[in-house]
Amino acid sequence: MKFIIKLFPEITIKSQSVRLRFIKILTGNIRNVLKHYDETLAVVRHWDHIEVRAKDENQREAIRDALTRIPGIHHILEVEDHAYTDMHNIFEQALALYRERLEGKTFCVRVKRRGKHEFSSQDVERYVGGGLNQHIETARVNLTAPQITVHLEIEQDRLLLIKSRNEGIGGYPIGTQEDVLSLISGGFDSGVSSYMLMRRGCRVHYCFFNLGGAAHEIGVKQVAHYLWNRFGSSHRVRFVAIDFDPVVGEILEKVDDGQMGVVLKRMMVRAASKIAERYGVQALVTGEALGQVSSQTLTNLRLIDNASDTLILRPLISHDKEHIIKQARELGTEDFAKTMPEYCGVISKSPTVKAVKAKIEAEEGHFDFSILDRVVSEARNIDIREIAEQTSQEVVEVETVASFVPTDVLLDIRAPDEQDDKPLALDQVEIKSLPFYKLGTQFGDLDQSKTYLLYCERGVMSRLQALYLREQGFSNVKVYRP
């Protein structure tokens, strides 16, 4: 099988040296992502496209899906590569592929050529289009608004019959811009803002301020791992967790109620800046949007920026909440965010919307900054690829099984669309469906006299959720890994 990768248009208008560098990086990214599907896969770069060839037909859909999620790709053409002899042979091959698809439809033919030929692209369009129109009685030509466009590409002596076109996410290849550190909370905003910087070519590392215990950290790890695995797995990234409870406690004790929100954000920026400096990261990323909460007015954002010299990027600054939630839904992070607790918003009862610099600095004068230095020095840094392995160690007390007894219940915790795509079909065991994002609120309603075997495709989510349920006091859970 063969795929033709078309570049994001902004790449094609770069200077020759920059364009070549971007294409080289994108080629490497594609190779890094796809090697997990087919080790014999070949990725070849050209001036205006990238070619992917693979032998394992069983991985066709997986490879196509992975390509649609790699930044830098505008669209993907799945093609059949054949030799041809003349225009009539081109028509015959097009007829064999498109006959059933064109029945009862309007169509046109569009041809792109590379190389020297005795015919023009328009000659092929007219010949093939006329032949299809004659041989498919219910098909009709429509050059302005066809229902189906027959795409053909001719490269020297090869004919590429385009079977399907799939849109990519566009943007720049990851690695073409410098690294950033995303302050991730697991909510709608931070997930979307992280994705937007990945799409713009940045390798996004994650910094999490833990205010809600192990369960909160598990949830945020799920979001970060999901974003990385889905859109950024071509690169290694860090997940840094900072226990911010001591800082919050100091703020609650020493800082005036109305200033708490801004002071907390300034402390987070200071801590994240230290982490960024430690790892050579150039900028911080937040999900802040203008006016969304009290700390996100222009006055307060300026004061938050002043807490550090590190550049702070806010890709969602002009987005409204409805639009952000829609983006989260499209990315697949909405379900995570809906069940993620919000701890920051309850710290102050009457927050100021127009903080005064002198007053903020006076309140911070009461703060013991050695606490901030300590929590930063104790920050836990892991390779995001190790989240699954680390979770396995954390859930060592949760048994992993490959078989079941008739009294067990297999709990499919995958998202509904995943369950529809690959439904479980097992005999001699009861199967229930309860998506992972509903476990926290609905697991307690199940019959607690039974043992539940949590299942997801890769075992990462099931282990994370098993740990979460254990912490909630449920001992009747195991992880099912066939």
UniProtKB/Swiss-Prot annotation:
The keyword Disulfide bond applies. The active site is at C456. Its main location: cytoplasm. GO terms for cellular component: cytosol. The keyword Transferase applies. Keywords: ATP-binding, Cytoplasm, Disulfide bond, Nucleotide-binding, Redox-active center, RNA-binding, Thiamine biosynthesis, Transferase, tRNA-binding. SMART domains: THUMP. Pathway: Cofactor biosynthesis; thiamine diphosphate biosynthesis. Pfam families: ThiI, ThiI_fer, THUMP. One of its GO terms (biological process) is thiamine diphosphate biosynthetic process. Its EC number is 2.8.1.4. Residues 61-165 form the THUMP domain. It catalyses: [ThiI sulfur-carrier protein]-S-sulfanyl-L-cysteine + a uridine in tRNA + 2 reduced [2Fe-2S]-[ferredoxin] + ATP + H(+) = [ThiI sulfur-carrier protein]-L-cysteine + a 4-thiouridine in tRNA + 2 oxidized [2Fe-2S]-[ferredoxin] + AMP + diphosphate; [ThiS sulfur-carrier protein]-C-terminal Gly-Gly-AMP + S-sulfanyl-L-cysteinyl-[cysteine desulfurase] + AH2 = [ThiS sulfur-carrier protein]-C-terminal-Gly-aminoethanethioate + L-cysteinyl-[cysteine desulfurase] + A + AMP + 2 H(+). This is tRNA sulfurtransferase.
